[in-house]
Amino acid sequence: MALLSRTDRSLIAQWWWTIDRWSLAAIATLIVSGVLLTLAASPAVAGRIGVEPLHFVYKQLSFVAPALIVILAVSLAGPRDVRRLALVVYVVSLLLMTAALFVGPEIKGAHRWLLIGPFSLQPSEFAKPAFVVLAAAALAESNRTPGFPGALVAGFVYAAFAGLLVLQPDFGQTMLATVVCIAMFFLAGLQWRWLALFGAAGVGGGVGAYFFVPHVASRVDRYWTAEGDTFQVNTSLNAFTQGGFGGVGPGEGSVKFVLPDAHSDFIFAVAGEEFGLAACTVLIVLFGVIVVRALRHAVEERDHFVQLAASGLATMFGLQAAINIAVTLSLIPAKGMTLPFVSYGGSSTLALALTVGMLLALTRRRAASQRGW
Protein backbone atom coordinates (compact mmCIF):
# COMPACT_ATOMS: atom_id res chain seq x y z
CA MET A 1 0.00 0.00 0.00
CA ALA A 2 1.83 3.05 -1.30
CA LEU A 3 -0.44 5.41 0.65
CA LEU A 4 0.79 4.02 3.98
CA SER A 5 4.16 5.38 5.05
CA ARG A 6 6.46 3.50 7.41
CA THR A 7 6.36 6.57 9.64
CA ASP A 8 2.56 6.51 9.79
CA ARG A 9 1.54 5.58 13.36
CA SER A 10 -2.07 4.70 12.54
CA LEU A 11 -3.33 1.23 13.47
CA ILE A 12 -3.78 0.11 9.87
CA ALA A 13 -0.35 1.40 8.85
CA GLN A 14 1.35 -0.42 11.72
CA TRP A 15 -0.60 -3.55 10.81
CA TRP A 16 0.43 -3.35 7.16
CA TRP A 17 4.13 -2.92 7.86
CA THR A 18 4.29 -5.67 10.49
CA ILE A 19 2.07 -8.34 8.93
CA ASP A 20 3.49 -11.26 6.92
CA ARG A 21 2.36 -10.04 3.52
CA TRP A 22 3.42 -13.23 1.71
CA SER A 23 1.13 -15.29 3.94
CA LEU A 24 -1.61 -12.68 3.58
CA ALA A 25 -1.33 -12.89 -0.22
CA ALA A 26 -1.42 -16.69 -0.12
CA ILE A 27 -4.55 -16.65 2.07
CA ALA A 28 -6.25 -14.15 -0.25
CA THR A 29 -5.39 -16.28 -3.28
CA LEU A 30 -6.84 -19.39 -1.62
CA ILE A 31 -10.07 -17.54 -0.83
CA VAL A 32 -10.42 -16.33 -4.42
CA SER A 33 -9.59 -19.83 -5.69
CA GLY A 34 -12.29 -21.24 -3.42
CA VAL A 35 -14.93 -18.92 -4.86
CA LEU A 36 -13.88 -19.76 -8.44
CA LEU A 37 -13.89 -23.51 -7.79
CA THR A 38 -17.27 -23.25 -6.06
CA LEU A 39 -18.50 -21.49 -9.19
CA ALA A 40 -17.15 -24.38 -11.26
CA ALA A 41 -18.40 -27.24 -9.07
CA SER A 42 -21.57 -26.15 -7.32
CA PRO A 43 -24.09 -25.56 -10.17
CA ALA A 44 -24.15 -29.30 -10.84
CA VAL A 45 -24.71 -30.02 -7.15
CA ALA A 46 -27.40 -27.32 -6.98
CA GLY A 47 -29.19 -28.89 -9.94
CA ARG A 48 -29.31 -32.27 -8.22
CA ILE A 49 -31.03 -30.86 -5.13
CA GLY A 50 -33.35 -28.50 -7.02
CA VAL A 51 -32.04 -25.03 -6.13
CA GLU A 52 -30.88 -22.23 -8.42
CA PRO A 53 -27.52 -22.87 -10.16
CA LEU A 54 -25.58 -20.20 -8.25
CA HIS A 55 -27.13 -20.99 -4.85
CA PHE A 56 -23.88 -22.22 -3.30
CA VAL A 57 -21.81 -19.47 -4.93
CA TYR A 58 -23.95 -16.74 -3.39
CA LYS A 59 -23.85 -18.45 -0.01
CA GLN A 60 -20.07 -18.85 -0.16
CA LEU A 61 -19.68 -15.16 -1.02
CA SER A 62 -21.86 -14.35 2.00
CA PHE A 63 -19.39 -16.35 4.13
CA VAL A 64 -16.29 -14.76 2.58
CA ALA A 65 -17.28 -11.18 3.45
CA PRO A 66 -17.43 -11.72 7.25
CA ALA A 67 -14.40 -14.03 7.02
CA LEU A 68 -12.30 -11.18 5.63
CA ILE A 69 -13.46 -8.96 8.49
CA VAL A 70 -12.52 -11.67 11.01
CA ILE A 71 -9.05 -12.07 9.49
CA LEU A 72 -8.40 -8.32 9.61
CA ALA A 73 -9.81 -7.80 13.11
CA VAL A 74 -8.06 -10.77 14.71
CA SER A 75 -4.74 -10.12 12.97
CA LEU A 76 -4.69 -6.65 14.55
CA ALA A 77 -4.52 -8.24 18.01
CA GLY A 78 -1.45 -8.81 20.15
CA PRO A 79 -0.49 -12.13 21.77
CA ARG A 80 -2.32 -11.29 25.01
CA ASP A 81 -5.52 -10.48 23.13
CA VAL A 82 -5.19 -13.70 21.12
CA ARG A 83 -5.02 -15.70 24.37
CA ARG A 84 -8.08 -13.96 25.79
CA LEU A 85 -10.03 -14.43 22.57
CA ALA A 86 -9.08 -18.12 22.49
CA LEU A 87 -10.37 -18.61 26.04
CA VAL A 88 -13.75 -17.07 25.20
CA VAL A 89 -14.09 -18.98 21.91
CA TYR A 90 -13.06 -22.26 23.56
CA VAL A 91 -15.59 -22.03 26.39
CA VAL A 92 -18.45 -20.92 24.13
CA SER A 93 -17.61 -23.56 21.51
CA LEU A 94 -17.55 -26.39 24.06
CA LEU A 95 -20.91 -25.26 25.44
CA LEU A 96 -22.35 -25.23 21.92
CA MET A 97 -20.81 -28.64 21.14
CA THR A 98 -22.52 -29.99 24.26
CA ALA A 99 -25.81 -28.43 23.18
CA ALA A 100 -25.46 -29.99 19.72
CA LEU A 101 -25.37 -33.45 21.31
CA PHE A 102 -28.85 -32.89 22.75
CA VAL A 103 -30.68 -30.50 20.43
CA GLY A 104 -28.67 -30.63 17.21
CA PRO A 105 -29.99 -32.53 14.18
CA GLU A 106 -28.54 -35.94 13.38
CA ILE A 107 -26.76 -35.71 10.04
CA LYS A 108 -25.10 -38.86 8.66
CA GLY A 109 -25.21 -40.41 12.11
CA ALA A 110 -23.51 -37.51 13.93
CA HIS A 111 -24.64 -34.58 16.10
CA ARG A 112 -22.18 -31.86 15.07
CA TRP A 113 -24.44 -29.02 14.04
CA LEU A 114 -26.74 -26.44 15.58
CA LEU A 115 -29.53 -24.85 13.54
CA ILE A 116 -29.80 -21.10 14.13
CA GLY A 117 -32.62 -19.76 11.98
CA PRO A 118 -31.68 -20.34 8.33
CA PHE A 119 -28.05 -21.01 9.25
CA SER A 120 -26.25 -24.11 10.53
CA LEU A 121 -23.24 -23.88 12.82
CA GLN A 122 -20.54 -26.47 13.55
CA PRO A 123 -19.04 -25.33 16.89
CA SER A 124 -16.14 -27.82 16.82
CA GLU A 125 -14.59 -25.92 13.90
CA PHE A 126 -14.20 -22.84 16.09
CA ALA A 127 -12.95 -24.83 19.05
CA LYS A 128 -9.94 -26.13 17.08
CA PRO A 129 -7.83 -22.94 16.92
CA ALA A 130 -8.91 -21.96 20.44
CA PHE A 131 -7.77 -25.32 21.81
CA VAL A 132 -4.35 -24.91 20.16
CA VAL A 133 -3.79 -21.42 21.58
CA LEU A 134 -4.90 -22.37 25.10
CA ALA A 135 -2.73 -25.50 25.14
CA ALA A 136 0.22 -23.40 23.95
CA ALA A 137 -0.43 -20.83 26.69
CA ALA A 138 -0.45 -23.54 29.37
CA LEU A 139 2.73 -25.18 28.10
CA ALA A 140 4.50 -21.81 27.82
CA GLU A 141 3.42 -20.83 31.34
CA SER A 142 5.04 -23.97 32.75
CA ASN A 143 8.27 -22.86 31.10
CA ARG A 144 8.02 -19.40 32.71
CA THR A 145 6.67 -20.44 36.11
CA PRO A 146 8.37 -23.42 37.79
CA GLY A 147 5.82 -25.71 39.36
CA PHE A 148 2.95 -24.68 37.10
CA PRO A 149 1.30 -27.90 35.79
CA GLY A 150 1.33 -26.80 32.16
CA ALA A 151 1.25 -30.30 30.69
CA LEU A 152 -1.68 -31.24 32.91
CA VAL A 153 -3.65 -28.11 32.00
CA ALA A 154 -2.90 -28.54 28.28
CA GLY A 155 -3.92 -32.18 28.55
CA PHE A 156 -7.22 -31.20 30.15
CA VAL A 157 -7.88 -28.62 27.41
CA TYR A 158 -7.26 -31.34 24.82
CA ALA A 159 -9.27 -34.01 26.65
CA ALA A 160 -12.38 -31.83 27.06
CA PHE A 161 -12.35 -30.96 23.35
CA ALA A 162 -11.49 -34.46 22.11
CA GLY A 163 -14.06 -36.06 24.42
CA LEU A 164 -16.87 -34.02 22.89
CA LEU A 165 -15.59 -34.81 19.39
CA VAL A 166 -15.77 -38.53 20.14
CA LEU A 167 -19.31 -38.19 21.50
CA GLN A 168 -20.55 -36.49 18.30
CA PRO A 169 -18.80 -38.64 16.84
CA ASP A 170 -16.09 -37.01 14.69
CA PHE A 171 -13.03 -39.24 14.64
CA GLY A 172 -11.28 -37.36 11.85
CA GLN A 173 -11.19 -34.12 13.83
CA THR A 174 -10.21 -36.09 16.95
CA MET A 175 -7.25 -37.52 15.07
CA LEU A 176 -6.27 -34.06 13.84
CA ALA A 177 -6.45 -32.56 17.35
CA THR A 178 -4.43 -35.46 18.78
CA VAL A 179 -1.61 -35.13 16.24
CA VAL A 180 -1.41 -31.36 16.76
CA CYS A 181 -1.36 -31.80 20.54
CA ILE A 182 1.46 -34.37 20.32
CA ALA A 183 3.43 -31.99 18.07
CA MET A 184 3.02 -29.14 20.57
CA PHE A 185 4.08 -31.34 23.50
CA PHE A 186 7.15 -32.36 21.50
CA LEU A 187 8.03 -28.75 20.66
CA ALA A 188 7.55 -27.78 24.30
CA GLY A 189 10.31 -30.23 25.20
CA LEU A 190 8.20 -32.26 27.60
CA GLN A 191 9.13 -35.70 28.82
CA TRP A 192 8.60 -38.65 26.52
CA ARG A 193 6.04 -40.16 28.86
CA TRP A 194 3.59 -37.40 27.91
CA LEU A 195 4.18 -38.06 24.21
CA ALA A 196 3.80 -41.79 24.79
CA LEU A 197 0.56 -41.19 26.68
CA PHE A 198 -0.98 -39.16 23.85
CA GLY A 199 0.37 -41.57 21.25
CA ALA A 200 -1.15 -44.54 23.08
CA ALA A 201 -4.44 -42.68 23.45
CA GLY A 202 -4.48 -41.95 19.72
CA VAL A 203 -3.69 -45.54 18.73
CA GLY A 204 -6.16 -46.92 21.27
CA GLY A 205 -8.86 -44.55 20.09
CA GLY A 206 -8.28 -45.52 16.46
CA VAL A 207 -8.40 -49.25 17.22
CA GLY A 208 -11.51 -48.79 19.36
CA ALA A 209 -13.24 -46.80 16.64
CA TYR A 210 -12.48 -49.54 14.11
CA PHE A 211 -13.96 -52.30 16.25
CA PHE A 212 -16.92 -50.47 17.76
CA VAL A 213 -17.99 -47.87 15.16
CA PRO A 214 -19.36 -49.55 12.01
CA HIS A 215 -18.89 -46.66 9.56
CA VAL A 216 -15.23 -46.24 10.60
CA ALA A 217 -14.59 -49.96 10.05
CA SER A 218 -16.39 -49.75 6.70
CA ARG A 219 -14.20 -46.89 5.46
CA VAL A 220 -10.97 -48.55 6.58
CA ASP A 221 -11.97 -51.89 5.05
CA ARG A 222 -12.90 -50.25 1.75
CA TYR A 223 -9.53 -48.53 1.67
CA TRP A 224 -7.46 -51.66 2.35
CA THR A 225 -9.45 -54.16 0.31
CA ALA A 226 -10.81 -51.87 -2.45
CA GLU A 227 -14.10 -53.72 -2.06
CA GLY A 228 -17.58 -52.36 -1.40
CA ASP A 229 -18.68 -48.83 -2.25
CA THR A 230 -15.53 -47.11 -3.56
CA PHE A 231 -17.42 -44.96 -6.05
CA GLN A 232 -16.39 -41.55 -4.68
CA VAL A 233 -12.69 -42.34 -4.46
CA ASN A 234 -12.58 -44.07 -7.86
CA THR A 235 -14.44 -41.16 -9.47
CA SER A 236 -12.07 -38.70 -7.81
CA LEU A 237 -8.99 -40.53 -9.11
CA ASN A 238 -10.51 -40.66 -12.59
CA ALA A 239 -10.93 -36.88 -12.48
CA PHE A 240 -7.17 -36.40 -12.13
CA THR A 241 -6.56 -38.83 -14.99
CA GLN A 242 -8.97 -36.91 -17.22
CA GLY A 243 -7.51 -33.55 -16.25
CA GLY A 244 -3.87 -34.30 -16.98
CA PHE A 245 -1.50 -31.35 -16.65
CA GLY A 246 -3.63 -28.50 -17.98
CA GLY A 247 -7.19 -29.71 -17.30
CA VAL A 248 -10.17 -30.11 -19.59
CA GLY A 249 -11.13 -26.46 -19.16
CA PRO A 250 -13.37 -24.41 -16.82
CA GLY A 251 -16.88 -25.85 -16.70
CA GLU A 252 -16.00 -28.79 -18.95
CA GLY A 253 -15.49 -31.41 -16.24
CA SER A 254 -17.87 -34.27 -15.54
CA VAL A 255 -16.92 -35.36 -12.01
CA LYS A 256 -19.03 -32.63 -10.41
CA PHE A 257 -22.18 -34.16 -11.92
CA VAL A 258 -21.75 -37.48 -10.11
CA LEU A 259 -19.84 -36.74 -6.88
CA PRO A 260 -22.31 -35.72 -4.13
CA ASP A 261 -19.71 -33.56 -2.32
CA ALA A 262 -17.99 -32.12 -5.38
CA HIS A 263 -18.28 -28.58 -3.99
CA SER A 264 -16.94 -29.45 -0.52
CA ASP A 265 -14.95 -32.56 0.43
CA PHE A 266 -13.97 -33.43 -3.15
CA ILE A 267 -13.45 -29.97 -4.63
CA PHE A 268 -9.76 -30.77 -5.16
CA ALA A 269 -10.88 -33.42 -7.67
CA VAL A 270 -12.85 -30.76 -9.57
CA ALA A 271 -9.72 -28.58 -9.62
CA GLY A 272 -7.69 -31.53 -10.93
CA GLU A 273 -10.12 -32.32 -13.73
CA GLU A 274 -10.95 -28.83 -14.96
CA PHE A 275 -7.66 -27.03 -14.28
CA GLY A 276 -5.20 -29.91 -14.17
CA LEU A 277 -2.09 -30.78 -12.23
CA ALA A 278 -0.79 -27.24 -12.71
CA ALA A 279 -3.62 -25.68 -10.68
CA CYS A 280 -3.43 -28.40 -8.02
CA THR A 281 0.28 -27.75 -7.63
CA VAL A 282 -0.37 -24.03 -7.19
CA LEU A 283 -2.90 -24.75 -4.43
CA ILE A 284 -0.44 -27.04 -2.63
CA VAL A 285 2.29 -24.39 -2.91
CA LEU A 286 -0.05 -21.78 -1.41
CA PHE A 287 -0.72 -24.01 1.59
CA GLY A 288 3.02 -24.63 1.86
CA VAL A 289 3.80 -20.90 1.85
CA ILE A 290 1.46 -20.26 4.78
CA VAL A 291 2.74 -23.20 6.84
CA VAL A 292 6.45 -22.74 6.14
CA ARG A 293 6.45 -19.00 6.75
CA ALA A 294 4.55 -19.45 10.02
CA LEU A 295 7.03 -22.09 11.19
CA ARG A 296 9.92 -19.86 10.17
CA HIS A 297 8.51 -17.00 12.23
CA ALA A 298 8.04 -19.41 15.14
CA VAL A 299 11.69 -20.47 15.00
CA GLU A 300 12.83 -16.83 15.05
CA GLU A 301 10.43 -15.87 17.88
CA ARG A 302 11.72 -15.56 21.45
CA ASP A 303 8.36 -15.76 23.20
CA HIS A 304 7.70 -19.42 23.99
CA PHE A 305 3.92 -18.98 23.81
CA VAL A 306 4.11 -17.47 20.33
CA GLN A 307 6.45 -20.26 19.23
CA LEU A 308 4.07 -22.98 20.37
CA ALA A 309 0.82 -21.32 19.30
CA ALA A 310 2.06 -20.36 15.83
CA SER A 311 3.56 -23.82 15.30
CA GLY A 312 0.36 -25.52 16.48
CA LEU A 313 -1.94 -23.39 14.33
CA ALA A 314 0.29 -23.84 11.26
CA THR A 315 0.48 -27.60 11.83
CA MET A 316 -3.29 -27.87 12.17
CA PHE A 317 -3.91 -25.75 9.05
CA GLY A 318 -1.41 -27.72 6.98
CA LEU A 319 -2.57 -31.13 8.24
CA GLN A 320 -6.20 -30.37 7.42
CA ALA A 321 -5.23 -29.50 3.85
CA ALA A 322 -3.01 -32.58 3.59
CA ILE A 323 -5.77 -34.89 4.86
CA ASN A 324 -8.32 -33.55 2.38
CA ILE A 325 -5.89 -33.89 -0.53
CA ALA A 326 -4.77 -37.35 0.59
CA VAL A 327 -8.38 -38.59 0.75
CA THR A 328 -9.04 -37.20 -2.73
CA LEU A 329 -5.98 -39.07 -4.05
CA SER A 330 -6.97 -42.27 -2.16
CA LEU A 331 -3.80 -42.15 -0.04
CA ILE A 332 -5.77 -42.54 3.21
CA PRO A 333 -9.31 -43.75 4.07
CA ALA A 334 -12.14 -41.34 3.32
CA LYS A 335 -12.82 -38.62 5.90
CA GLY A 336 -15.12 -35.64 5.55
CA MET A 337 -12.68 -32.77 6.08
CA THR A 338 -12.73 -29.54 4.09
CA LEU A 339 -9.88 -28.10 2.05
CA PRO A 340 -9.11 -24.81 3.87
CA PHE A 341 -10.72 -21.78 2.19
CA VAL A 342 -11.30 -23.79 -1.01
CA SER A 343 -14.17 -26.09 -0.02
CA TYR A 344 -17.67 -24.69 0.35
CA GLY A 345 -18.85 -24.20 3.93
CA GLY A 346 -19.78 -21.40 6.31
CA SER A 347 -18.53 -22.74 9.63
CA SER A 348 -15.33 -23.97 8.03
CA THR A 349 -14.62 -20.66 6.26
CA LEU A 350 -15.27 -18.51 9.34
CA ALA A 351 -13.34 -20.82 11.67
CA LEU A 352 -10.40 -20.90 9.28
CA ALA A 353 -10.54 -17.10 9.15
CA LEU A 354 -10.21 -17.12 12.94
CA THR A 355 -7.30 -19.58 12.64
CA VAL A 356 -5.27 -17.59 10.12
CA GLY A 357 -6.20 -14.32 11.83
CA MET A 358 -4.61 -15.64 15.02
CA LEU A 359 -1.65 -16.94 13.04
CA LEU A 360 -1.08 -13.59 11.33
CA ALA A 361 -1.41 -11.79 14.68
CA LEU A 362 1.17 -14.03 16.34
CA THR A 363 3.67 -13.82 13.48
CA ARG A 364 3.59 -10.04 13.15
CA ARG A 365 6.89 -8.27 13.79
CA ARG A 366 6.79 -6.59 17.18
CA ALA A 367 9.29 -5.00 19.53
CA ALA A 368 8.32 -7.18 22.51
CA SER A 369 5.71 -9.83 23.15
CA GLN A 370 2.90 -9.26 25.59
CA ARG A 371 2.97 -11.69 28.46
CA GLY A 372 0.34 -12.65 30.97
CA TRP A 373 -3.41 -12.72 30.61
List where the protein language model places each region:
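A juxtamembrane structural motif centered on a specific transmembrane helix
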Residues: 1-4, 325-373
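Hydrophobic alpha-helical transmembrane segments of multi-pass inner membrane proteins, especially
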Residues: 24-40, 46-232, 269-327, 354-358, ...
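Short, Lys/Arg-rich, polar N-terminal cytosolic tail immediately upstream
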Residues: 1-16
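Glycine/serine-rich anion-binding loops at beta->alpha junctions
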Residues: 117-127, 167-169, 244, 248, ...
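Juxtamembrane loop-helix boundary motifs flanking transmembrane segments in multi-pass membrane proteins
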Residues: 7-11, 49, 53, 155, ...
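Transmembrane helix boundary and interhelical junction motifs in multipass membrane proteins
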Residues: 170-175, 247-252, 262-264, 277, ...
